[in-house]
Amino acid sequence: MKGKRVVLAGFYPPPFAGEPVHVMQLAQLLRDHGLSVQILNLNRQASPSQDYHHSGGRLGLLWRLLTLADRAAILHLHTNGHSRKSWLMILVASLAGRFRDVTAVLTLHSGLLPGYVAGFGTIERRLARWILRPFTRIICANPEICRSVKAIGSVGVQTSVIPAFLGVSHAPELSPQDRTLSEGFRPLLVAVAGGEEDPERGLAVVLRAVQQLVPVHPDLGTILMGWQVGPKTRPLIQELGLADHAVCLGEVSHDRCLALLRASDVVVRSTFVDGDAITVREALAFGVPVVASDTDFRPEGVTLFRRGDVSDLAVKLSHVLAQPTGRDPSRRPAHDQSASMWELYAELLGSENTASGLVQPPPRPAAST
């Protein structure tokens, strides 16, 4: 049986985006099960921290990725898969599996991956197959990513679709400042950006839809947030005359994001591309209605609008806002993937029902409204 040590390699908060939050939550899940977890933060701009290993230099980071895990450990790389930089990381983790006998696991997060690998030529596809072969498991955030990986022609590599959502373990309260902000808007829309090369592109669609809805809902307001959000969005708010109806917070902590999601009347996800948006599932876990663009994949329980279509978004928001506001916990779709993720790890560890002495974690509390 493999040892009880895991090295998780990926971005780690901050920033508070989907992949970093997932890495943080996965580390906690594995520790709850009795595993020793080390984190390699692949963000070269990260500040030093006792929470993770890191390196400000590219070579130093690649060396740590190659050597931090030994043959008794599991190396689990989290990356987007839609850039050369990402595939360099995949290559190095692959080499750790190929030449150092490390159990290597790969999670691919990005909805941009299918389009990226579709552009591979014959040589690139052969190289990609060689790179992916040493991975014991490849986890994909949605089915379309999984189909793209299989289309490369990887032989002998087991793939799984496990959305990057491990539940909501607590329901943070609004700060006094955010409570005042949110109570000034009724109804309150919360829009979270991310998932693509220009995270602000979809927020422009939200703002223009809000502009159409204000005559009908004069107290309506929207709070916009996300990593790398602000430089384009704040000027657009002024340009559209929405200073009294929209606030751009930019990047916020995960707890602050959860509190705002929980307080909202509708959550909007307007990206043009997505892997699996954690915030969508978090909102659904709180019983908050979600209106989201029709990307390749959205979970059960979401109201879809045509991506980029301002009028369709306005129509769908109007429909949702016209519904009763009560939240019925029994109608929430089940999205928590903790059990699926632990089942995969238990298999990798060669342990059924944690017979090796690994503990069962305490049950997670359900997200409250």
PLM feature spans:
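Nucleotide-activated donor-binding/catalytic signature segment of Leloir-type glycosyltransferases, i.e.
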Residues: 234-252
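Glycosyltransferase donor-sugar binding loop
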Residues: 41-45, 192-196, 221-234, 250
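Short beta-strand->alpha-helix junction loop in the catalytic core
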Residues: 144-145, 152, 161-172, 192-196
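Aromatic "clamp/platform" in nucleotide-sugar-dependent glycosyltransferases that forms part
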Residues: 272
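Short hydrophobic beta-strand element within catalytic cores of glycosyltransferases
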Residues: 280, 289-292
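A charged, aromatic-enriched C-terminal amphipathic alpha-helix characteristic of glycosyltransferases
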Residues: 322-359
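Conserved donor-binding/catalytic core segment of Leloir-type glycosyltransferases
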Residues: 7-8, 177-201, 207-210, 223
